[in-house]
Amino acid sequence: MTLEEIKTTVLYIQGLQALWKEDYNAEKIGDYTFGIVCRDYNTTDELWEVINELQFMGEGEEWEKTKEEVETLIQEKLGIRICDPISILSYTINLFIKQLTSDFSTNSLVLSFIEQTKELITYQEYTLALENLLKSLLEKYIFIPRDTLAILDNIEDTQIQRLQASLWRV
């Protein structure tokens, strides 16, 4: 998955979450989704399947989906719970860890940091887990590939952003 695909997925879900707060409106969801199509973002196959199913909502009864159907579709295709604000954070951190594991598959020190992080994630401590992982990487001056580190651009936590900025300089 490319960085642009990750950012598109996060942007799309954040937009849907904002629409959810206004109350469920199929036509608005269809319009918003169609706007994403018009911008020609790079998407994953899974996100494209979601977009294809939702872009015509509000255009007629045959395209309509209930709130629950949309939530289920997104959960099944993307693994993101639209009503759960922590879901995007979880999604982003899990992608970062997956890519980091791939980048450092032979580095036992980094892999041990990742295992410690996974233990905290088990307890839903996403921000703390990521913060600890980034601090450990920074303390050991471990260079993280730019594309991998950029996955975290979507996280809006000041401490995480500071640690990420410090890791850019390693």
Model feature map: region roles:
Residues 3-25, 32, 102-103:
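N-terminal acidic leader/helix
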Residues 25-67:
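Acidic, low-complexity, intrinsically disordered interaction modules
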Residues 8-11, 15-18, 49-52, 56-59, ...:
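Extended, non-membrane alpha-helical segments enriched in charged/polar residues
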Residues 5, 42, 121-125:
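Structural motif
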Residues 55-58, 63, 67-170:
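C-terminal-biased regions
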Residues 21-40, 104-119:
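A short, compositionally biased N-terminal segment around positions ~18-40 that is enriched
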Residues 1-14, 83-95:
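N-terminal intrinsically disordered, low-complexity tails enriched in polar/charged
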Residues 5, 28, 35, 73, ...:
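Generic short N-terminal amphipathic or hydrophobic helices
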